[in-house]
Amino acid sequence: NRTVPVVILTGHLGAGKTTVLNHLLRHPGLRAGVIINDFGAINVDAALVQGQIDEVASVSGGCLCCLDDASQLDEALDALSHPKLALDALIIEASGLAEPGTLARLVWLSPVTHIRLSSVVDIVDAKRHFDTVDLGGVPPRRYGVASLVVINRIDELTAQERVGQVVRIEARIRQRNPRATIIHTRH
């Protein structure tokens, strides 16, 4: 009765989700299944990761958290978590439009019995974050759902920008979620 951990990978459009996913998939010995949610009919992200993963499923036609029902997601979770595949983990790469909390609830409430929600990883674009995701006021809800926040693209900031911008992003995350683990990465 083994359950397969599900990791939800979220982030705004262009934050670096596919880059982070590709990095994870290169980890030797990891047998992962990936569910990719591309917004639209052409699955660009699916093409980018083909050949690097053990099993893949794509859910298209809209943002996972906005679909009329979760049956496509449930079917993908069920197929990829089948015991015969013996995968170590399932990774859902969400559309940049996805609401992390809604997506986490869909996995949590899924009727698929051999999965468990492991974590929500939110990818943040250090350079464009305050122009795209966090526009001020109350910190975005997405921070509250994430168990891990990856502040990505810090290499695109000058040393001076890095100090101010990263500290500001971390402070906003901590306002909403003091327990989140925060790491920095280069694109």
Residue ranges: model-predicted function:
Residues 1-10, 15-132:
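Nucleotide-state-sensitive switch-loop elements of NTP-binding domains
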Residues 38, 93, 146, 152, ...:
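Residue-level signal for inorganic ion chemistry
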Residues 102, 134-137, 161-164, 168:
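Generic recognition of short, well-ordered alpha-helical segments
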Residues 108-117, 139-143, 166-175:
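A short alpha->loop->secondary-structure connector
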Residues 127, 154-156:
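Acidic beta-to-alpha connecting loop that harbors the catalytic carboxylate
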Residues 133-145, 149-151:
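Flexible active-site lid/hinge loop adjacent to a nucleotide/diphosphate
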Residues 148, 156-187:
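C-terminal accessory "lid"/substrate-recognition subdomains
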